[in-house]
Every structure is written in structure tokens, then in C-alpha cells.
């Protein structure tokens, strides 16, 4: 066969010349592109490539087995543990030369073992034979000595006994020969047993050394191929080893003892204490008693306190705080008791308390703000930069029946007061009025004492307060309260002295009384404008409007008109056909129909907007009051209204506020429970008046609830079981029946299903339209629960003139009735020198010798006092009776 060049061979093999030259170089043959290749060189290259591309030197097998192990537990119960054993083994392909070398070593090892075994057997045989010969020689010597003794003794005996002695000697000789044979057999068995044990020991030692040499030679697999336990449980490890032996069929037994010992650095290895305990258990013997390890320490090293960074939200439970500090809940409770606060492990505590406890225990506290989402939503709003003048928001305040609503009616030329029950404004009305000089927004607040929170809310949302004072009535309690609200809000006050047309009007007295509370007229050097008006005659109305606009110019009121709107809820209620309705006063921006609003705990999209006249509007600018529809629920009056971008985020913020309010409420309730614990223990039985309250608007619900709760006394407490806005439903009636409560409807009525429940349960249902009547009737109901007052009333006096002795009653006082009537079986007091010396009961009352029930003034009688004999002449017997007086709540 002719030689071929590198280029030709590369073309045949369909590879590049450079790659082929490199392959020849790897095979130890240096060639260039133009060199020729012989057949031997080609065969060398092929052998090299076959060896290089042969199968893998290593083969890795992974196996996973699952089993269940029943572990005995405390109390005789056992629990099942699922065990999963994962194995990974690597098998290495041996080199043929290495295999031959190992085979030769094994053959030499086997020959050495066989030689050692034969030598041991021969040595044991020699020792056994020598020992048997020595024992036989000694036995023969002993027998010869005994025979000599017996022969000497036989010579002294009578000759007729020689035949018998001969027979006995023969039998004894046979017996001795048998004993010698038995002794020789036992010696041979003992020698054979020792020989076998020695051979077995030598073979086991040789096999162990061979196994160790084999594993040392095959030590190429790394720690990944080592067999390790996947659990630290002793029972699970035993089950794993049993499973390994079943699967492997006894393969690799030579290293079981070695593998049972965990390697250094193995994270699954047992601890030192566990290993000592296992060794002690093995050494325990038949009794199975464990002995304490002598190497185990008798003390534990004290652990150093770890100071952690504890992140605390606005509220947290005691258990969660303990987990954050990695301590037991009992330690946190002890720390709180040291600080003077009692708590349970599930109690919610506020951020300040949790901070004190954590710092007291040596940890660093990180306070977390939980309203980050809320702040992000509020900051992502479009607000215009240019501020424009806006209309003033004016709140009319004053005492009840001083003419606030009538004054506003005249300004608006409507009859709003006629629609209010009893002529009293029940909730805030918001109206905007167009005048010749500009627009003014009026807020009408109730003047009754119950509506304090509503009045305060009106003052916070206003720019100017018009204080209406009746000229004939002067300053009244609600007038003073309105002044305080105005001062707290920091808004200017314009005083409207109303009812100036009445003959008994005295405006100067009004000025003097208001000056005592810091409201000084301008003519006296003060800052407040005083305007004399008459809501009925219409006098002074223009002057009042001019004064309001003048004050607004001084304030330079401005607001951003463009951008997302924000404002406040003036009033809210639940309409049966429209759902939740909120009266909103826009402060800045423009509120459009379709905007997404966030309002306290509620959110929603503005589906419709109406002004105070009930007309549909599409937008509302600053200082404009509107009713909006589309909220998820009835918001609380006074809540902030904000237009946001995303309805989903608005919902998240609303839900977060609800959860936060609930947590704070629970924390407050827990705190009040702990603080009032001892007070509740001592106050005894307290009667409760349960009430389910429904009203037309949210403001009325708040006002009535506050007024009723203030009626509570130490003996009778008012408890509002449920309250809400809207008509009385079947759910309200069921709640009232379950809690034995009174159903109160303020400007609302019960529906048909609720009336059926009320009739079936015979519930007490009451309708009201004026708050005075509601409070008076609840007072009457509470008065009926008061226990009556016991009063002692003196009905007669009798003077002791003489004392007689009676065998039946003892000392009998002969008396003259000086005042009133003395009645039998009534309680009495015995007075001596006007000092009570005894209080008891009149047992016997006689006139002459007849028993009588009563003796009137000016008559003589005999009186026997029960269980009392120390009656003297000159004493006065006072007869009284106990009467019950029904108490009332003031």
C-alpha cells in the first residue's frame, strides 16, 4: 500500500489539515501538511483516537428510596416518619494494566493467606500432639505408682482373695485405658478448635487488609461519591442502613464499619455527645443501661446575649414581638409587668409600648411606617401650580332657636327651615349663594348641644364664622361653645345680632356679654364686625353680606382650580334608591364626574354629582358643595376626600385604613379592659339599656350616640348595640331581639320584613324626629331601671310615763302618744335625752287590756319592745315606717 500525504488523508477523513496535524502531534508523531503518512503511523493515530474517544472512565449512579419508620413516642404513642434516602455512587473504569496488577496482588494475597493458614494448622497439630504425649506420659507414671501401691497391699491379703483382686485389677485397667482415650480425644478437639479460630482470625485480618488496600487504590472518586446520611435521627439512620443492605445485597460490607463513622466536616454527622451516648449504650451489656460518658462536660457554656434589630409596626402582638426578639413570650410578659403593664401573649400593643419593651430587653428598635402605600398614592396626583381667588366658606353658628337657618333662608330666598322637624336643623346644610358682589358658600350647623362634633367639623372646614346671637336672649351655652370652636380653628368671627326688630332687643347687652369671651366690636378697638339684622324683616342682610365679603378680601382666599380635587365630607347618608350619598365640600382642584375618589375607609368612582338644588352637574370647583354617588359605603362625616389615579390602589389604601382602625380599636379596648379591671370588680351589678339606633344621616347618628352615652350613670348604663344610616331592616330587628334592645329610628322607618320580626318578637320600636324627645324618653326608660330610694318617715311619738313588768313580754312601757299614730309591728327607736339608744320592733301594743293595731294622738297605751327591757321613765319611743321613692335621672 502506498503512503498518502497529510492533505490527502485530511480529505479522506473530511477534516482540516491543521486538525489532522494536531491529532498526529497528540499521538506523538510530528508531521507537516506535505509529509507522507505510512500505514503504521496511520494505525498509531487510529489507536490513539480510539483510546481517546472510548467510553467514560466514570459512571455515576443516583438512587432514591422511600420508606416509613414508626418511632415510639411519649405516652405510648408512635408516630410515622417518612424517610427518603438519596444515594450517589461513582464507578471508575479501571485500566487493563491496573486490573492485571490488582489481580496479581490479589493472587499473591490469597497465596499468602493459604500459606499462613497451612502453617497455622501444622503448628497447632504439633502443639496438640506434644501436649497429648506429655499428658499420656504423666498418666502412665501415675498409673505405675498406683499399681505398685496396690501390689504391696495385695501381698498382705489372704491368698483366697487373689482371684477376686485379679479380676478387679483387670477391670480397673480397662477403665483407665478408656479414660486415657477420652482425654486424648478431648485434647485433639481442643487443639482443632483453637486451630480453626486462629485460622479464621488470620483469614479475617487478611481479608480486611485486602479490602482496605482495594479502597485505598480506588480512592479516585471524590467526596461526592461518599455515602452519607441525609438525616441526623438515629432511628432514621438505622432504617437507611438496613435499606442499603437490602438493595446492595451485601455488596461493600467491608466498608460498612468505616462508613458508619461520620467524616470530619460532614454536616449530617452526629454531634460528639450523640456519639458518646451511642458508645455508652453499646457498652451497657445485657441490662441495656446507659452510662454517662466520662468525656461529657458537666456544665454548659453560658450563651452570650444577642442584640437584634427589631422592626416594629404601628401595632404588634406580644407573641410576634417575642418571635422578632427570639425569646419566649413569657419573658416579654415579665418585662412588661416590670414596666407596669399587664398583657397576654395574644394581646395587641401599640408601637410605643413595644418600643419600650424591646429597648428594655437590650434590642435596637426600627420603627416602620405602614402607610407608605397611602403616601405614595397621595403624592401621585396632578395639582395645578397657579392659585386663583375662590369664594369664602362661611359657617353660621349660634345657640338653638336664635335664627341661624331663618337668616340663611332669607338670603337664599327659600324655606329650608320648614322642612326641618320642630324647626331645628338636624344636620349640616351646605349651600352656595350668588350675590351681586360675588359667590358665598354657607354651611348651616345645628345649635343643639348634641351636635358638638358637627359644629366642630363645620368650623374646621370654614373660612369665616358668622355668630348669630339673638338680641333678646343674649349669650347662651352653645354660643360660648361656638366661640371656642372658632378660636380653636383660628377663623375670624362676624357677629350677626338677630331679632333686632323685637321690642325687648338689647344689642348693647350682647356686645357686653361677648366682650367677656374675647369677641370685641371694631368700634371698641376689636377685630370683629357686628351687624344688626332681622331674619324675618330682612333688615341688615345686605350689610351682613358686605361684611362677609370684606372679611374675605382681607383673608385673600385662593385655591388651585385645575388638577385633581380634594375636599371634606360635610354629611353622608344611605339612600334607599341611590346607595351611599356624601355631601362633599371641594377645597381645591376640580371634581369631575367619573373621578376615582378615596374617602376615609371608603372608595369609589363618582357616578353622579348633584348640587344643593338636586340638579345634575358634571364638575365642581373650589368652595362648591355637591352630593356625590358611587362610594363603596357611607363615609364618616369629616373624612378627607381625595381624587386618585388608580382604583385598585385606592381600594388597597381603604382596606389598609380599615384594618389599621380595627387594630387600633382592639388595642384601645384591651387597654381599657385592663385599666378598668379593678373598677369593674367593685362596682357590682349594673343595669344596661341596650339601643339599636338608625338615623337618616351620619352626623345625626354621631350626635345621638354621644348624647345617649353621656346619660350613663354608675347604676344604669346606655349601650349602643348597633347604629347606622338608613332605614330599619330585618337584620337590625334580629339584632335587637337577640340583645334585648330598644329599636330607635330617627327620621327613618322600618321596612315590611323588619316589622314582621318586630311584631313576632314584641320589640320596642320608637320613631323620633326631634332629638329632645328621644333623649327624654331614654331618660325615662333608664329611670325605670333605677332601684327605688328607701326613706324613713316618722309617723308617731310616745312618751314613757311608767314602766310595768309582764311575765310574758318583760318590761312594758306605759306611754302617752304625743304626736301622730303608733302602729303595731312597725320599727321603732328608743330615745333617751334625744339620743337613739335602741332600734328595734314594736312587739306588743295594748290599750287597757285589749290588743290594738294602732293608738292615736292623746291616748294612753302599753308598749312592749321586742328583745329590749331597759326602758325607763322619760324615754321617748319614736315609731316610723320605710317608704320607697322612685328616683329619676336628671
From Swiss-Prot:
Matching entries from HAMAP family are given as:
IF_2_B (MF_00100_B)
One annotated Gene Ontology cellular component of this protein = cytosol
* Classification via SUPFAM superfamilies: Initiation factor IF2/eIF5b, domain 3 (SSF52156), P-loop containing nucleoside triphosphate hydrolases (SSF52540), Putative DNA-binding domain (SSF46955), Translation proteins (SSF50447)
Q: Where is this region: G5?
A: 534-536
Q: Where is this region: Disordered?
A: 45-304
InterPro entries per record: DNA-bd_dom_put_sf (IPR009061), EF-G-like_DII (IPR053905), EFTu-like_2 (IPR004161), IF2_assoc_dom_bac (IPR013575), IF2_II (IPR044145), IF2_N (IPR006847), P-loop_NTPase (IPR027417), Small_GTP-bd (IPR005225)
Which family is it part of? Answer: Belongs to the TRAFAC class translation factor GTPase superfamily. Classic translation factor GTPase family. IF-2 subfamily.
Region annotated G1, chain positions: 398-405
Query: Which residue ranges does the record annotate as region G2?
Result: 423-427
Every copy of the tr-type G domain together lies at 389-558
Annotated PANTHER family: TR-TYPE G DOMAIN-CONTAINING PROTEIN, TRANSLATION INITIATION FACTOR IF-2-RELATED
Return the annotated region ranges for G3: 444-447
Write the record's keywords in alphabetical order, separated by commas.
Acetylation, Cytoplasm, GTP-binding, Initiation factor, Nucleotide-binding, Protein biosynthesis
Taxonomy, superkingdom: Bacteria
Q: Which residues carry this modification: N6-acetyllysine?
A: 808
**Pfam families assigned:** EF-G_D2, GTP_EFTU, GTP_EFTU_D2, IF-2, IF2_assoc, IF2_N
Annotated segments matching region G4: 498-501
Give residues annotated as binding GTP.
398-405, 444-448, 498-501
Among Gene3D superfamilies, the record links this protein to: P-loop containing nucleotide triphosphate hydrolases (3.40.50.300), Putative DNA-binding domain, N-terminal subdomain of bacterial translation initiation factor IF2 (3.30.56.50), Translation factors (2.40.30.10), Translation initiation factor IF- 2, domain 3 (3.40.50.10050)
| Polar residues composition-biased segments | 67-81
Q: Which GO terms describe its molecular function?
A: GTP binding; GTPase activity; guanosine tetraphosphate binding; translation initiation factor activity
Where do Basic and acidic residues bias regions lie?
92-217, 267-280
Positions with biased composition (Basic residues): 252-266
Protein role: One of the essential components for the initiation of protein synthesis. Protects formylmethionyl-tRNA from spontaneous hydrolysis and promotes its binding to the 30S ribosomal subunits. Also involved in the hydrolysis of GTP during the formation of the 70S ribosomal complex.
Subcellular localization is given as: Cytoplasm
Species of provenance:
Escherichia coli O81 (strain ED1a)
Q: What is this protein called?
A: Translation initiation factor IF-2
